[in-house]
Each structure stands twice: as C-alpha cells, then as structure tokens.
Amino acid sequence: EEKARIAKELDALGVDRIEVAFPAVSKEDARALKAVADLGLNADIFTFCRAREDDVDLAVACGADGIILEFPCGEPRMVHQFAKWTEQQVIDLTVRIGKYAKDKGLQVVMFPLDATRARPDFFRRLMDEAGAQPEMDSVVLVDTTGSLTPQAADALVRDMKRRTGKAIEIHTHGDFGMGVAVSLAAVAAG
C-alpha cells in the first residue's frame, strides 16, 4: 500500500522510471510490484532480478516494464557469495539472461554488483562482451562498497560509455562519505 502511494506521488512529479521491489525475495515484494504495475502510471516500472530465468518470468508475471539485472562481477562476491563463478560464466550468463528478458518484452538495465572491486581487465571485457549487447538498454556503474573516488568515477563512466555505446547510470554507497561526490562526478562525465 505504501509502495503504491509513493509510486503515485513519484509519477505525479514526472519521474520516468520507478524501481519497485525484488519479487524473487518475497511474496510481499511480488504483490507490491504487481500493485504498482497495475496502477497504469506514466512511469516505466522496473524491478530487480537475479540472473535467472525464473526471476525474469516473475517480473513479467507481475507486470514490470523492465528489469535491473543483478549479477556479481567483483571477485569477492563471485568467489565467496556465488559458488565460485568464473569470469566467463558471468559474461555468458549476463548475455543469456539479457536476451531472455528482451525476448519477453522487457527493458534491461545491466547492474554488475561490486563493479568497483572487479579486476579491471575483466570489467573491460564485461563491458565489451555483455554491456555492448543490443539487449542491454543501459549499464550501471555499481559501487557496492562505497570505495570509488570522484576521479575514478569520471574515468570509469567515460570508458563504459565508449565501450558500450549505452546510457550509463550510477549506483553509489556512502560507506566512506563519498557517495554524493562520486555521483556528481559520474553525472558530469556523462
């Protein structure tokens, strides 16, 4: 109920994309997403999905317009949280699920968790081989640990834009008090 009220207010303000819930996490989140999607707002309704077909199917069933496709790319998460995924597995899975979601009619935002702790060579490959795919509508620079500096954000955003040709978004955390400065540097970089 509260999510629907907030979504209506955001829509009235002219917000063009509203990110609602993570339906794979709970039935309550799935109900909230469906309730917001059923409002018929002008804003596109997006939801978070893991890199799994069943998550994408749930987003479709709940009426989402698009997904924020989460997957690990920082080495600590790939090795310790996600059963030792390899870099190539991450790339292949991201491309496959992006295509699957696009075939279901969804917009796709590529959201590489822990991007700022990824090996630089791998992150560049990820942008070249997955981020540049036509199924990806935009790519997010995800600073999960809040460790990015404004200068690094500027360089990464410029490189991501060059490699993918896509709109680049920023997702920061304020662990070290730099979230706002990093966000502003990313916006200034394009």
Where are these regions (language model features)?
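A glycine-rich helix N-cap at a beta->alpha junction
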Residues: 40-49
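Conserved hydrophobic beta-strand within the GNAT/NAT acetyltransferase core sheet
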Residues: 20, 47, 110, 170-172
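Alpha/beta enzyme core
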Residues: 1-18, 31-39, 53-167, 182-189
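Histidine-centered catalytic micro-motifs
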Residues: 168-177, 182
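Short acidic loop-to-helix transition motifs that present clustered carboxylates
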Residues: 27-29, 50-54, 175-179
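Anionic-ligand anchoring segments at beta-strand to alpha-helix junctions in alpha/beta enzyme folds, i.e.
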Residues: 21-25
